[in-house]
Amino acid sequence: MISSSKRDELIVSKIRNGTVIDHIPAGRALAVLRILGIRGSEGYRVALVMNVESKKIGRKDIVKIEDRVIDEKEASLITLIAPSATINIIRDYVVTEKRHLEVPKQIRGLIKCPNPQCITNNDVEAESRFITISIKPLKLKCKYCEMYITEDDVIRQIL
């Protein structure tokens, strides 16, 4: 999947079908793989490019997964740790769908409130709900107990 054509250039071959997640902030690709439940033994062909130059965000990571399309829940979780990411769906070597991720104004059921006293941690029927306070840096507020969580808190939950 990887070949070198020039001294300073690394080329990752195209995938026939699957997903390419581009513009992931540098160092976050492993967290993206964790969200997707990919540990290396599932049989997917995966290309991971980390800490490469990007005109858009300075440095970035890229994840390519052959024969795997991510679902909405996975895309929503990726949005929280990589709000500038782009998800490209590939079919027969062609990008058939391109999604630019955006952090939603409200987040429901994706992450847990870290407050042990929050109703969402004490009532099995209560779904966690967070309101987005800021995107850069990511700051969310629990709708029930009003506890704030940051991007680092979200990453800790994922990892």
UniProtKB/Swiss-Prot annotation:
Record-linked Pfam families: PyrI, PyrI_C
Cofactor section: Zn(2+)
Lineage top rank: taxon: Archaea
Residues binding Zn(2+): C113, C118, C142, C145
Gene3D superfamilies linked: Aspartate carbamoyltransferase regulatory subunit, C-terminal domain, Aspartate carbamoyltransferase regulatory subunit, N-terminal domain
GO annotation, biological process: 'de novo' pyrimidine nucleobase biosynthetic process; pyrimidine nucleotide biosynthetic process
Molecular function as annotated in GO: metal ion binding
Keyword Iron-sulfur: no
Record keywords, A-Z: Metal-binding, Pyrimidine biosynthesis, Zinc
Described function: Involved in allosteric regulation of aspartate carbamoyltransferase.
Subunit structure and binding partners: Contains catalytic and regulatory chains.
Protein name per Swiss-Prot or TrEMBL: Aspartate carbamoyltransferase regulatory chain
Organism: Saccharolobus solfataricus (strain ATCC 35092 / DSM 1617 / JCM 11322 / P2)
